[in-house]
UniProtKB/Swiss-Prot annotation:
Organism: Rattus norvegicus (Rat)
Functional note: Acts as an adapter protein of the FYN and LCP2 signaling cascades in T-cells. May play a role in linking T-cell signaling to remodeling of the actin cytoskeleton. Modulates the expression of IL2. Involved in platelet activation. Prevents the degradation of SKAP1 and SKAP2. May be involved in high affinity immunoglobulin epsilon receptor signaling in mast cells.
Residues recorded with modification Phosphotyrosine: 570, 698
A GO biological process held by the record: T cell receptor signaling pathway
Annotated Polar residues bias: 15-55
Entries under PROSITE patterns matching the protein: SH3
InterPro entries: FYB1/2-like (IPR043443), FYB_hSH3 (IPR035540), hSH3 (IPR029294), SH3-like_dom_sf (IPR036028), SH3_domain (IPR001452)
UniProt superkingdom: Eukaryota
Phylogenetic placement of the source organism: Eukaryota, Metazoa, Chordata, Craniata, Vertebrata
Name the record gives this protein: FYN-binding protein 1
Modified residues (Phosphoserine): 38, 56, 233, 329, 456, 572
Biased composition (Acidic residues): 450-464, 621-636, 693-703
Region called Disordered, residue ranges: 1-501, 601-646, 660-739
Subcellular location: Cytoplasm; Nucleus; Cell junction
């Protein structure tokens, strides 16, 4: 009953306003004690408080679960405010045994109740240091010490809104001061009565401020910052000072929720008016309630924490009181916290238990019903099959707390949970494949599982997509490869063009002979470099610098090689040339016999040809130049082949007529060339010359890619001389020098071609020659290289010198030449 009377006196004094400064100066000064006191200590404090009489001061200490004693005497110790006014330095900068945390001095005197508190900025304990106090059980202390420390701590909370930098002092350091304070126990009793002579609750409006600063206090985890604001009653200060050091910073909400229900008086919960007048706090509690309703997992987690924490902190309720607005709001929030899971639609996982296991897929599904339904009712096929086929999937989609629906339930649904699937198209798609492989197995075994079919369809589509990606990759790779090949081809063509231009190559490049290097040669600008024993392909043996051939190595590099630097088997080369030119030499002989014997020579090879072959024999085939031996068999063809050859022959006639007229002028000189070739029969170029002469009549018709006949004729003319002169390297060097002079002096570009041969008139008399004129003798034979104009031509004499010769100095055989060409035209036209 004493507790109830104290509550009534508290409520009465709480409703009466008073001076705020007096309240601040006279309010009890609780201190923060980290740790937990045993229930026996609490009972002893209650008994001690009851022995003091019916004094009213216990508003502050009586509602606190641990402070059952009164304030120390007024003249015992100086207050912290008085010391701060006297001393420029705060006493907390240098910690001593007891004073740094609780502010107790051995020679302190209790402050004057009438003195107004000046809100200085002393260094007070850090919030972090307060929250870091461990929760070890504290040794029971004398009641006087607790009240003395309570007054000092309340003073600290009044003066110290800003945290200082002084570290806390361990609890063990407080023991030396217990004996001193216990001696003054008898003097403490009247102090609360003097303090209560003044109004306890000066500002009623201060009670509303904790609602505004509660969130800040929870965010900053700093309890001392809220203490100057929460001064609605000493009960508030008691709750604040006793509750804050016990709770760690991160466990404030949970600890407060459990600390609020307990009070020093059983079954009594104080609800001061300040809590009713704080709309901000109620709004915050409502907002938190809404958050807890929406955030289900968080509430479950908090519920588990609430169940676990009483075991960890069994005596926490004794540290807090429920008299303050802050404590009351936390009590309400704690009640709501414990009650909210009941209002949730989904109970916690501990109540629900493990979720039901997912039903396994049926191994076999009979689809005969669906076929009958499709054949009977096409309109109902989207209802019954889907309702039955969707039986296995629905249980996972339903809430776990609900029992599984009966089998007939899906038929009543307006639409299936899955999108409608047409059964017939998969059957139609699968049917032709199974017809090919198993001849209608689907009809016999009921088409198998529809789910498996659809899964296989999905796999098939995935394979198609992957195959498309592969095809795209292949296409890209092929494009890259084609581009690389094109680039390489272009590079090869470019190199080939450069080589053709550099070495004046015409027509396809053919390998005439293979030779082996007999020594190491370090090539020059146009010369080929090779090592001893390396295989060299001879590309051209004519129209080269004297004593050199055009060769190619296995690496693909071109250049001139000296004939003395390679070993050549002339016998094999001659046999090869003869086999290559086996067919063309026949028309050459006919050409020298003025075309009349062509049919006679060609007759043995064309026994099956028609009678028209006597007039014009079929020309060699297109491949005659390359495959001479095989062409003999090709000539023994039937009449259609003869027709094709005659057509090609007529085309060749037009091409011959279109060529230069000077081609035929060299025919008269052919006998000389043939004689020289017969003399040099051991040398291999003679068959090549005969091939070139034969091209005049036949080969030039079909071999459009081969070098023009005039060039080859000139090569044939010069080959006999060069090969005869190969034994004399001096003449070869001289010839090369003359060719260089020709190109330099006469600015002659291109290959040196002999248009025709002629003779100097015998009536020529010696005269002076110019720098570019060729010194000639009467009756000397000349080779015409270029027809410069109507008065002079560029000629070459037997010595290999070049120069201009007047046409008047030459034998006038133009008429004969042109008549011969005309005759050739007549023969061609026939």
């Amino acid at each position: 009953m004493d507790g109830k009377t104290d509550v009534k006196s508290l409520m009465a004094k709480f409703n009466t306003g008073s001076n705020p400064t007096e309240e601040v100066s006279t309010s009890s000064r609780p201190f923060k004690v980290a740790g937990q006191n045993s229930p026996s200590g609490i009972q002893s404090k209650k008994n001690l408080f009851d022995n003091q009489g019916n004094a009213s001061p216990p508003a502050g200490p009586s509602n606190m679960s641990k402070f059952g004693t009164t304030k120390p005497p007024l003249a015992a110790k100086p207050t912290y405010e008085e010391k701060s006014e006297k001393e420029p330095k705060p006493p907390f900068l240098k910690p001593t045994g007891v004073s740094p945390r609780f502010g107790t001095q051995p020679n302190s005197v209790s402050r004057d109740p009438e003195v107004k508190v000046g809100f200085l900025k002393p260094v007070s304990p850090k919030p972090t240091s307060l929250t870091k106090e461990d929760s070890k059980p504290v040794i029971l202390r004398p009641p006087g010490n607790k009240l003395h420390n309570l007054n000092q701590e309340s003073d600290l909370k009044t003066l110290g809104p800003k945290p200082g930098s002084t570290p806390p002092v361990p609890e063990n350091d407080l023991k030396p001061g217990f004996s001193k304070i216990a001696g003054a126990k008898s003097k403490f009793m009247p102090a609360p009565q003097d303090a209560d002579s003044k109004p306890r609750f000066p500002r009623h409006t201060y009670g509303q401020k904790p609602s505004l600063s509660t969130e800040d206090a929870q965010e900053e985890e700093s309890i001392p910052k809220n203490t100057p604001v929460q001064k609605g009653s000493p009960v508030q200060l008691g709750a604040k000072s006793r509750g804050s050091p016990f709770k760690p910073a991160k466990e404030d909400p949970e600890d407060k929720d459990h600390g609020t229900p307990s009070s020093p008086f059983a079954g009594v919960v104080l609800k001061p008016a300040a809590s009713r007048g704080s709309p901000g706090l109620s709004k915050n509690s409502e907002e938190k309630k809404e958050e807890r309703k929406t955030d289900i997992p968080k509430n479950i987690f908090l519920n588990k924490l609430n169940q676990e924490e009483p075991a960890r902190f069994p005596k926490a309720p004794s540290k807090l009181t429920a008299g303050t607005p802050w404590g009351q709001s936390q009590e309400k929030e704690g009640d709501k916290d414990s009650a909210t899971p009941k209002q949730k639609p989904l109970p916690p996982l501990s109540v629900l238990g493990p979720p039901p296991s997912k039903p396994s897929r049926p191994p076999n599904v009979d689809l005969t019903r669906f076929r009958k339904a499709d054949s009977a009712n096409s309109s109902n096929k989207s209802q019954t099959p889907y309702s039955t086929t969707s039986l296995p999937p629905p249980p996972p989609t339903q809430p776990a707390s609900q029992p599984p629906l009966p089998a007939s339930h899906p038929a009543h649904l307006p639409a299936p949970s899955l999108p409608p699937r047409n059964i017939k198209p998969p059957l139609d798609l699968k049917h032709p494949i199974n017809e090919e492989n198993q001849d209608g197995v689907m009809h016999s075994d009921g088409t198998g599982n529809l789910e498996e079919e659809q899964e296989s369809d999905g796999e098939m589509y995935e394979d198609i997509e992957s195959s498309k990606e592969r095809d795209k990759k292949r296409e890209k790779e092929e494009k890259k490869r084609l581009e690389l090949e094109r680039k390489e081809q272009k590079e090869r063509e470019k190199k080939e063009q450069e080589l053709r231009k550099k070495f004046k190559l015409t027509g396809p490049i053919q390998v005439i002979h293979h030779a082996k290097a007999c020594c190491d040669v370090k090539g020059g600008k146009n010369e080929l470099s090779f090592k001893q024993g390396e295989d060299i392909e001879i590309i051209r043996i004519t129209d080269n610098p004297e004593g050199k051939w055009l060769g190619r190595t296995a690496r693909g590099s071109y250049g001139y090689i000296k004939t003395t630097a390679v070993k050549i088997d002339y016998d094999s080369l001659k046999r090869k040339k003869n086999t290559i030119n086996a067919v063309p030499p026949r028309p050459v002989e006919e050409d020298q016999d003025v075309y009349d014997d062509v049919a006679e020579q060609d007759a043995p090879n064309s026994h099956s040809q028609s009678g028209s072959g006597g007039m014009f024999p079929p020309p060699p085939a297109d491949d005659d130049i390359y495959d001479g031996i095989e062409e003999e068999d090709a000539d023994d063809g039937s009449v259609p082949q003869v027709d094709e050859k005659t057509n090609a022959w007529s085309w060749g006639i037009l091409k011959m007529l279109k060529g230069k007229d000077e081609r035929k002028k060299s025919i008269r000189e052919k006998p000389k060339v043939s004689e020289s070739d017969s003399n040099e029969g051991s040398s291999f170029p003679s068959p090549h010359k005969q091939l070139d002469v034969g091209e005049e009549v036949y080969d030039d018709v079909d071999a459009s890619d081969f070098p023009p006949p005039p060039a080859e004729m000139s090569q044939g003319m010069s080959v006999g001389k060069t090969k005869a002169e190969e034994k004399d390297p001096k003449k070869l060097k001289k010839q090369e020098k003359e060719e260089k002079d020709l190109r330099k002096k006469f600015k002659y570009d291109g290959e040196i071609r002999v248009l025709y041969s002629t003779k100097v008139a015998s009536s020529l008399t010696s005269k002076k020659w110019g720098t570019r004129d060729l010194q000639i003798k009467p009756g000397e034979s000349l080779e015409v290289i270029q027809s410069t104009d109507d008065t002079k031509v560029l000629c070459r004499n037997e010595e290999g010198k070049y120069g201009y010769v007047l046409r008047s100095y030459l034998v006038d055989n133009d008429g004969e030449i042109y008549d011969d060409i005309a005759d050739g035209c007549i023969y061609d036209n026939d």
